[in-house]
Swiss-Prot record:
EC annotation from Swiss-Prot or TrEMBL: 6.1.1.1
Disulfide bonds: none
Entry-linked PROSITE patterns: AA_TRNA_LIGASE_I, S4
Residues noted as binding ATP in the record, renumbered to the chain: K234
Organism: Lactobacillus acidophilus (strain ATCC 700396 / NCK56 / N2 / NCFM)
Name the UniProt record assigns to this protein: Tyrosine--tRNA ligase
Localization annotation: Cytoplasm
'KMSKS' region (motif): residue ranges: 231-235
Quaternary context: Homodimer.
GO CC list: cytosol
GO molecular function: ATP binding; RNA binding; tyrosine-tRNA ligase activity
Gene name of this polypeptide: tyrS
């Protein structure tokens, strides 16, 4: 049986930008079953975000094809900061911050990759043991300053200044690849396009110290842009996190289900494990019946399940269906808070109040006349029930958990009213 061609699959999915030695990597994959590959992430925060999924999806595909992925947490480099993609110096973190972030990221990665045929390493293990004299003698002599200055990541910072600390980051990352290659048999490094210079520096160091025939390869990923030309990865509310405490499964699901028709097929290829045939079928449905949003629903389903599991997906779908249909009575307070986090909000007292006054006082309606008209026309729902009597009294004692009264105006215009 022929081997699965992982590189061709990645190309079809639009996941490869540059390769250092495609022919050499293909030859290695054809002759060996033991490829190990890695990508690094510095513990600059306590949660991964969807931008991290871009390289991680490639590692996951290699893992599913039987290869050995390694994620390198930059406990050493994270204390310094990668200048790639930045115009200003990073604020250095305390040792306590770095340690806390490392633990949080490790737990998230284990959820994505499991524990079989997967490894998490920390470069503090070896970088922390190198003193300045050893650094200069054993590694520094292999790096030419003129070459380092010409790397894009450094050249773009020279005008405004770059510290020696960040200038040496590429040497530290090169040491990482050298260490993992020599001691752990890692042959391939994955990174974003802005990591090309750091990756090639690592390969050069390996070849200088271990010989030019030592297998060492690099692969970078294209910059993910949306159809409107903006960078992928942000929602209207900012970063989309993998931590459910920062971005709830419902918000996460909504991010994917609201993707543009022009982007959705690209994201299906990149962020799901659906087959070529399944994706092509969804592409056809998007073209013929875009209003059904079949591709967006499948995208949201697959990525939410991958990150938050079956339970997180079911909850996200339950909240979505309830808010869409208006049948919200079976939602828990936590689910209501998830679903209406970004909805307009208001406050009201704990006393009963006529519905017309309630709507005006909470600024849901601009005037009593408009409030009466909307109530009579059946456009107002209180906690899921349509109220058409202008004499109806809103009773806070019937609020969800004694805390929230939910007003819906029209089909899906919700306001979350907190009872004080």
């Amino acid at each position: 049986m022929a081997k699965f061609d992982i590189l061709e699959d990645l190309k079809w999915r639009g996941a490869i930008n540059q390769e250092t030695d495609e022919e050499g990597l293909r030859k290695y994959l054809a002759e060996h079953d033991d490829l190990a590959l890695y990508c690094g992430t510095d513990p600059t925060g306590d949660s991964l975000h969807i931008g991290h999924l871009i390289p991680f999806m490639i590692l996951k595909r290699f893992q599913m094809a039987g290869y050995h992925p390694v994620i390198l947490i930059g406990g050493g480099t994270g204390a310094i900061g990668d200048p790639s993609g930045r115009t200003t110096e990073r604020v250095l973190q305390t040792a306590e911050q770095v340690k806390h972030n490392e633990e949080s990221l490790t737990n998230q990665m284990k959820k994505l990759f499991g524990t079989e045929n997967f490894e998490i390493r920390n470069n503090a293990e070896w970088l922390g043991k190198i003193n300045l004299i050893d650094f200069l003698r054993d590694y520094g002599k292999y790096f030419q300053v003129n070459n380092m200055i010409n790397k894009d990541v450094v050249a773009s910072r020279l005008e405004n200044g770059i510290s020696f600390t960040e200038f040496t980051y590429q040497i530290l990352q090169a040491i990482d690849f050298y260490h993992l290659n020599k001691d752990d048999g890692v042959q391939l490094q994955i990174g974003g396009g802005d990591q090309w210079g750091n990756i090639t520096a690592g390969i050069d160091l390996i070849h200088k110290l271990e010989g030019s025939d030592r297998p060492a390869f690099g692969l970078t990923i294209p910059l993910m842009l949306k159809a409107d030309g903006t960078k992928f990865g942000k929602s209207a509310g900012g970063a989309v996190w993998l931590d459910p405490e920062k971005t709830s499964p419902y918000e996460f699901y909504q991010f994917w289900i609201n993707q543009d028709d022009r982007d959705v097929v690209k994201y299906l290829k990149y962020f799901t494990f659906l087959s070529h045939e399944e994706i092509e079928d969804l592409a056809e449905k998007t073209e013929k019946e875009p209003w059904k949003r079949a591709a967006q629903k499948k995208l949201a389903e697959e990525v939410t399940k991958f990150v938050h599991g079956e339970e997180g997906l079911k909850e996200a779908q339950m909240i979505t269906d309830a808010l869409f249909s208006g049948d919200i009575k079976n939602l828990s307070v936590t689910q209501i808070e998830q679903g209406l986090k970004n909805a307009p909000s208001a406050e009201a007292g704990s006393e009963k109040k006529n519905i017309v006054d309630f709507l005006v006082d909470t600024k849901i309606e601009p005037s009593k006349r408009q409030a009466r008209e909307d109530v009579k026309n059946g456009a107002i729902y209180v906690n899921g029930d349509r109220e058409q009597s202008v004499d109806f009294e809103v009773d806070p004692s019937s609020a969800f958990d004694g805390k929230y009264v939910i007003i819906r105006k029209g089909k899906r215009k919700y306001t979350l009213v907190t009872i004080k």
